[in-house]
Each structure stands twice: as C-alpha cells, then as structure tokens.
Swiss-Prot record:
This is Siroheme synthase. Then it catalyzes the NAD-dependent ring dehydrogenation of precorrin-2 to yield sirohydrochlorin. Finally, it catalyzes the ferrochelation of sirohydrochlorin to yield siroheme. It holds the Pfam family Sirohm_synth_M. The modification Phosphoserine is found at S128. Pathway: Cofactor biosynthesis; adenosylcobalamin biosynthesis; precorrin-2 from uroporphyrinogen III: step 1/1; Cofactor biosynthesis; adenosylcobalamin biosynthesis; sirohydrochlorin from precorrin-2: step 1/1; Porphyrin-containing compound metabolism; siroheme biosynthesis; precorrin-2 from uroporphyrinogen III: step 1/1; Porphyrin-containing compound metabolism; siroheme biosynthesis; siroheme from sirohydrochlorin: step 1/1.
Length: 465
C-alpha cells in the first residue's frame, strides 16, 4: 500500500490553490465542500472559481505564485500546466511539512485525491494511488449506483441517537448487534423509502421501550419489469437482495428471480388462464401471515404491480391489518415491450393518446367499450390478449376500425427470446396461429406499429414477420 487512506479535517482552515483554470476549480470545489477557507493564486482566475472564493470569504491573489503564499496553510494544491512551477510548489510545501497535491504528478504529491462517493456524513473514497485514476472513477461510478443517496440520512439518524444507545447498551457487542439490526431492518427501510420522520419516530419508540421489542415484518411490493434484468430499478434490486421470503408469479423472468437473496425462501404463487396455483385471497393472507412473523416479504410481480397486477388488492389487505409495506414501480410491459420492438406508443403524426386494456377472455368474449377503442389517433395495448386475439381483432373491425390497421403481437418482450409478429387486424390472428406462440405476450394496435419497419433496434429470437 503506497498511500495510507486518511480523512483530513479542513473545517475553517486555510487551503492554498495555485492555479486559476478548470482543474483548479474542480479541486477548489472539493476543498470548499469540506469547509476549507480558500486562498487562490494565479495571474488569471476562472470566473466560477472567483465566485466560489468570494462566497466562502477566501483570498484571491491575481498574480504569480510566491514562496510566501504557503505559511499558515493546512493543504496546498498545485493545479497549473507549468511543470517547473508545480515542482517548486511541491518542494516548498514538503520543506515546510505541509501536505501537498500536484495534479497529474503523483511523484510530487505527499497526498492524493481519491474518487469520492459522497453520502455525507457517510463518505466512500476509492484510490489507485495515482496509477489508474480512470479505473478509480469507474469503480466510484459503480458504487454510486449501489449506495442509495439516502444513506447519508441514515448515517445522520444514527449519529443523533448514538449517545442514547450507548447509555442504554454499555456493552460494545450489544451495541454492535443493535446497530446491525437497525441498518438492515424496518427503521432503515423507512429512511431509504423517503420517510425519515417515521423512521425517527420508530427509533424513539424502540429506545423508550428499553429496546425490548418484537421484530416487525414488512412487505415489499416490487415490479420486476417486462423481463430484462437491466430494467430493474436500484430500489427493486436492493429489496430483492434483503428479503427473507419471496412470493413470485409466472411473469417474473428466471434471470430476475436469480437476483434475489440466495437463502431466501421462495414461494411460487403464479397464475395461468383459468388456473390459479394459489388463489388471490390466499396470496393476500400469506403476505399478512409472513409479515406478522417478523419477516421481510418480497412480493415480486412482472411488469408494474399497479397495472393489471392486482397490487391494489394486496396492499389493501396489508393496510387493513396494519402491516408496513412499500411499493416499487416497475417498467410495465406496454412501455418495455413496445420500446424493444421499435414501436413508439405515441407519435405526433400517428397517435396522441395510448390506452392500456385487458384482453383477458371470460366465457369466450371480452366486455370492453369497443366504440371508445376505435376512436382515431390512439394506440391500443392489450395485456393478456393471446387467447382473445381473434375476438379482439374481429370486434375492433366490427365497430369501425379498418381491417388494414397495423397490429403486432410481442412474445417475451425485452428478453433474448423476444419475437415480434407484425401484420394488420385482418391477418395478425392467422399469422400468430401459424407459429407456436406462448405467453407472456402483448398486443399493440395502431398506426404507430408501422414505424417498426424503421425503428426496430433490438434483435431477439427469430421474428414472426
């Protein structure tokens, strides 16, 4: 290890920046964020750097650097394109025992700047010792996606209650277990879900009760999207990896299910047409029962849980029993599959509105407002429309839609197995019947379908047309 990682307190202390350009500005911003008072020396100073120094009550010295600029400084930055000057600044700083950083010259540095993930008061630093700064920045970018922005609020909450917890739990091991449970439990989830006041109230109640409590479970109603794991939200992935129990349905792609916590219990509660592995009422009760046992329960649904996903029924049951829950939206099949098929759902020249419709047949027919569905200037998206496709196309034509209206059926959209069958209301049912097609599928009807010929960009499996 060439450099020892340390965090340097600069609150109210003087920091010298030699240089007045873009690079100096970037370094000065970091120093200002850390509470340093800036002294900037350069013949010409960037306008934004000038404003930064003036706002912080610092010093602007519009002239060449002088050796007498260093005394009293806690840190010195050389950020010029003059190599001899940078070397002189480094030599003088080292002679005085002042930490110095010379941009892009590790050999002249006694300290270096890491790539920083700022979730103050939580701060993560990544460094390659100056050998591969681009790699360090790439790692930082990954960390930025993995660490929720609200972790700073969570750390702040812990800081405010640290002394009280220490009084209640004088034993170090007990405190460690307490904080581990807090950072992985319901209080942390309230903060991460954007409900910090509720989290603080729960923590107050727990401390007032002398820390004796029963674990309270929670239900995460999470939309898994249309199939491609890359379309999951950060929050969905985080909750998937911490749940104790997973209830998943048929539309959740195997690749997405594999991202759940490895040791979590998995319960399949999927439904097929006229065949419910677990009735909806039983699913509702299961969610309540499991959460009442103190478990973190993931209800994982394909697409978005509030679009033909019966998510409203499930959280209504949870609310009735006082079970904490949170809902994580997912990319619904309509937007995901249409995008991957190259079909914009709205377009200035073809469709000014879009309508999501259930295509599910009951007793061989559909009870839909057909007169409204044939209005011009709209795109229709039918969920669960594979079996009812002939009826859907027939009824649209019977109520006034042209038989030549473009229409498409998408199978397993957004995945490597995606297939798209393009045709018209007149011939799409026959086209699909000539191929072996299985759910999940989505049907899109409207003039926008014809744009697929130009806009298709994602090639999945062999297409139907």
């Amino acid at each position: 290890m060439d450099f020892l990682p340390l965090f340097h307190s600069l609150q109210g202390r003087l920091a010298l920046v030699v240089g007045g350009g873009e690079v100096a500005l970037r370094k000065a911003r970091l120093l200002a964020d850390a509470g340093a008072r800036l002294r900037v020396v350069a013949p010409q100073i960037h306008i934004e750097l000038r404003h930064l120094v003036e706002q912080g009550g610092g010093e602007l010295l519009e002239r060449d650097y002088q050796d007498g600029d260093q005394p009293g400084c806690a840190l010195i930055i050389a950020a010029t394109d003059d190599e001899p000057l940078n070397a002189e600044v480094s030599r003088a700083a080292n002679a005085r025992g002042i930490p110095v950083n010379v941009v892009d010259a590790p050999a002249l540095c006694s300290v270096i700047f890491p790539a920083i993930v700022d979730r103050s008061p939580l701060v993560v630093a990544v460094s390659s010792g100056g050998d591969a700064p681009v790699l360090a920045r790439l790692i930082r970018a990954k960390l930025e996606t993995w660490i929720p922005s609200s972790y700073g609020q969570l750390a702040g909450l812990a800081s405010r209650f640290r002394n009280r917890v220490k009084e209640l739990l004088p034993d170090l091991q007990q405190r460690r277990v307490f904080w581990e449970n807090l950072f992985q439990g319901e209080i942390a989830e309230r903060v991460l879900a954007g409900r910090p006041a509720e989290a603080e109230r729960l923590l107050e109640e727990r401390l007032a009760g002398g820390l004796a409590h029963m674990a309270t479970g929670e239900v995460y109603l999470v939309g898994a999207g249309p199939g491609d794991p890359d379309l999951l939200t950060f929050r969905a992935l985080r909750l998937m990896q911490q749940a104790d129990v997973v209830l998943y349905d048929r539309l959740v792609a195997p690749a997405i299910l594999e991202l759940c916590r490895r040791d979590a219990e998995r319960l399949y509660v999927g439904k097929r047409r006229a065949e419910h592995a677990v009735p909806q009422e039983r699913i509702n009760r299961l969610l309540v029962e499991l959460a009442s046992q103190g478990k973190r329960v993931l209800r994982l649904k394909g697409g978005d849980p509030f679009i033909f996903g019966r998510g409203g029924e499930e959280i209504d049951e949870l609310a009735a029993h006082g079970i904490p829950f949170q809902v994580v939206p997912g990319i619904t099949a309509a937007s995901g599959c249409a995008a991957y098929a190259g079909i914009p759902l709205t377009h200035r020249d073809h469709a000014q509105s879009v309508r999501f419709v259930t295509g599910h047949l009951k007793d061989g027919t559909t009870d839909l407002p057909w007169k409204d569905l044939v209005a011009p200037g709209q795109t229709l998206v039918f969920y669960m429309g594979l079996v009812g496709l002939p009826v859907i196309c027939e009824q649209l034509v019977a109520h006034g839609r042209s038989a030549q209206t473009p229409a498409a059926l998408i199978q397993q959209g957004t995945t490597a197995q995606q297939r798209v069958f393009s045709g018209t209301l007149e011939n799409l049912p026959q086209l699909v019947a000539e191929h072996e097609v299985h759910a999940p599928t989505l049907v899109i009807v409207g003039e926008v379908v014809q744009l697929r010929d130009k806009l298709a960009w994602f090639e999945g499996a062999r297409e139907g047309a």
